[in-house]
Amino acid sequence: LKKSLFLVVFLGLATLSICEEEKRETEEEEYNQGEDDKSEEKRFLSLIPHAINAVSTLVHHFG
């Protein structure tokens, strides 16, 4: 009986550990995706002044 109980507890803890690890990996992936989105947004926003300058130059040149 002790061996059976030990086995049940061990398997339960192993399953719980695996679930916690998967949850942690999922949260880490979501965090990294959010960081990637922020990085892309920063790159896009940094291009806006260059685009404005290019349009301004074209308008000034042809206008």
Curated annotation (Swiss-Prot):
<keyword id="KW-0878">Amphibian defense peptide</keyword>
<feature type="propeptide">
    <location>
        <begin position="20"/>
        <end position="41"/>
    </location>
</feature>
<keyword id="KW-0165">Cleavage on pair of basic residues</keyword>
<keyword id="KW-0929">Antimicrobial</keyword>
<protein>
    <recommendedName>
        <fullName>Phylloseptin-Az1</fullName>
    </recommendedName>
</protein>
<comment type="similarity">
    <text>Belongs to the frog skin active peptide (FSAP) family. Phylloseptin subfamily.</text>
</comment>
<feature type="modified residue" description="Phenylalanine amide">
    <location>
        <position position="62"/>
    </location>
</feature>
<dbReference type="Pfam" id="PF03032">
    <property type="entry name" value="FSAP_sig_propep"/>
</dbReference>
<dbReference type="InterPro" id="IPR004275">
    <property type="entry name" value="Frog_antimicrobial_propeptide"/>
</dbReference>
<dbReference type="GO" id="GO:0042742">
    <property type="term" value="P:defense response to bacterium"/>
</dbReference>
<dbReference type="GO" id="GO:0005576">
    <property type="term" value="C:extracellular region"/>
</dbReference>
<keyword id="KW-0732">Signal</keyword>
<feature type="signal peptide">
    <location>
        <begin position="1"/>
        <end position="19"/>
    </location>
</feature>
<keyword id="KW-0027">Amidation</keyword>
<comment type="function">
    <text>Has antimicrobial activity.</text>
</comment>
<keyword id="KW-0044">Antibiotic</keyword>
<keyword id="KW-0964">Secreted</keyword>
